[in-house]
Amino acid sequence: MTNLNTPFMIGNVEIPNRTVLAPMAGVTNSAFRTIAKELGAGLVVMEMVSDKGIQYNNEKTLHMLHIDEGENPVSIQLFGSDEDSLARAAEFIQENTKTDIVDINMGCPVNKIVKNEAGAMWLKDPDKIYSIINKVQSVLDIPLTVKMRTGWADPSLAVENALAAEAAGVSALAMHGRTREQMYTGHADLETLHKVAQALTKIPFLANGDIRTVQEAKQRIEEVGADAVMIGRAAMGNPYLFNQINHYFETGEILPDLTFEDKMKIAYEHLKRLIDLKGENVAVREFRGLAPHYLRGTSGAAKLRGAISQASTLAEIESLLQLDKA
């Protein structure tokens, strides 16, 4: 089998393998990014950050920009509706953080974002995509990338949008295989992703959406034509998937899934890092929402999930996970 797990370049930044952790709001903070990195992710992308939050020195926003040692290469994703504001925020990030890459969100489908003329709203207008990327790219020395969807209501502009981004100067493009209207329903549109992969001739293309197994990851490379796979929801509760994909790309061998005990060890490590980042009260509250992902597919999950949802301290969760000595 040909080794698919070779490094690739985003601008002047070398990504050591073909797996990327997608940005996910409320999930891909430094606590989870460091775990994903240790378990094989070649590049990790920060949860989306508001350009206005940076502009107004919002304390919560600035705290989100924290990058731990060992995360690099890492990317910070920005969202916003005004190209001048986005450019100022990108410049601030370049000068004040340890990021290697800046990414622009052109795919978020949630109403709160699109009502503010940001995220997936841009998918309606390739000219605006070009204008915004061209402006932001002009103030940066580090690579600029973009993450988008196949379209707003349909994928008719997918290739045109991608080519506009490429012409404007992005160093890589990631695309989720659903339209904004689909949200997260239905299936990723692999035919459209393939068309985009063929159209982009100067930059790497990252395929995103419905990559839950090593075989699906391989399909995105070999059949869709992507240069790398970007994994979001499937990595929640199973960041070991990055290691499985890397191993499969190198050897063709499928590593077995982790045992329940090993999954709980990762979950516990995730919680401890959240506590270091945000303090016990906030971390435990957030972990209650993350725990169901780690418990997916395990016997007795409902009972344990219910118990964790009532926990309010690290000690309680340690007891429930039976990892008191971890």
Protein language model features and the residues they cover:
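Flavin-dependent oxidoreductase catalytic cores
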Residues: 1-326
